[in-house]
Design a protein with these regions (language model features):
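N-terminal, polar/charged subdomain of small-to-medium soluble alpha/beta proteins
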Residues: 1-122
């Protein structure tokens, strides 16, 4: 049986945050880039915002979670996904990646990143 799948996403959301395992990272902070993608079966194509994922809400979730200092980026991603599926229970799949620009390590590293995905058991 064929069905439509819809994607609503944010790419390259730039944030400054205090995430990091080392105490100095939580003092100095760093620049981060977030990508957030949701996928779901659309309920209808009737031009109603209530029947889709509002990317403004996704941005609010990302901005709010980036303000909550965490040691591990994985924790930030898990919190973002949890809020997305709580707000939009019809979402089948969520993927979030979080890049830390210029991570504090020897050498020249453009960014490190962590990616986490959730798939509904529906």
């Amino acid at each position: 049986m064929s069905q439509f799948k819809q994607t609503v996403a944010l790419k390259d959301v730039k944030c400054f945050a205090l995430h990091g395992y080392y105490p100095e990272e939580q003092l100095i902070g760093n620049h981060f880039v977030v990508d957030l993608e949701t996928e779901f079966t659309p309920q209808a194509f009737d031009d109603q915002l209530a029947k889709t994922v509002n990317y403004e809400h996704l941005n609010t979730i990302v901005q709010d979670e980036m303000k909550n200092t965490q040691k591990l980026l994985e924790t930030v991603l898990n919190n973002i996904i949890s809020k997305v599926i709580a707000l939009y229970p019809f979402v089948d799949h969520v993927t979030v990646s979080l890049k830390k620009l210029n991570p504090p390590m020897p050498g020249q590293v453009g960014h490190s990143f962590v990616k986490l995905s959730y798939t509904s058991a529906k």
